[in-house]
């Protein structure tokens, strides 16, 4: 595999990397103007974390390759959206997540520049079960 940059995230516990996921879908960047070293990942396999089977996805992965992410445990889905994830919009994300997994945790960063509204959502069977509001810091605690 060639070395390059990637859109990725890692699940870390006690300083150890438990799982390192690299986005498999192309992001919205202009590839004509971007670094030629950018690489998409290929691994969508599940992993165990505290005896729970988990699958990782990033941003547009579930919209483009939903069949690659079938899981029986919990889907972890960090996204970057800078629009209001209101009830109807978060409901669309819940339905998309349900195509691959019965339970999903969607997390959006909170930042001023670039603007991102934050928020965290726990989806179960295509419905929003719990959420942390937009535009504020906090922790969403869910039982899986």
Language model regions located:
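Active-site catalytic loop in hydrolytic enzyme cores
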Residues: 2-73, 86-89
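Short acidic-glycine loop/turn motifs at beta-strand connectors
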Residues: 12-16, 123-127, 144
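Generic detection of short hydrophobic beta-strand segments and adjacent strand-loop junctions
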Residues: 47, 140-144
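CN hydrolase (nitrilase-like) catalytic-core segments centered on the catalytic cysteine
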Residues: 63-139
């Amino acid at each position: 595999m060639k070395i390059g940059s990637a859109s990725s995230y890692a699940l870390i516990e006690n300083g150890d990397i438990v799982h390192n996921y690299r986005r498999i879908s192309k992001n919205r960047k202009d590839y004509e103007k971007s670094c030629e070293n950018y690489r998409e990942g290929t691994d969508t396999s599940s992993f165990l974390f505290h005896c729970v089977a988990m699958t990782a996805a990033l941003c547009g992965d579930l919209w483009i390759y939903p069949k690659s992410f079938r899981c029986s445990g919990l889907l972890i889905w960090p996204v970057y959206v800078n629009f209001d994830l209101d009830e109807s919009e978060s409901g669309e994300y819940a339905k998309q997540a349900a195509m691959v997994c019965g339970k999903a945790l969607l997390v959006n960063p909170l930042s001023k520049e670039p603007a991102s509204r934050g928020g965290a959502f726990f989806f179960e069977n295509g419905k929003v079960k719990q959420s942390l509001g937009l535009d504020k810091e906090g922790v969403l605690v869910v039982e899986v």
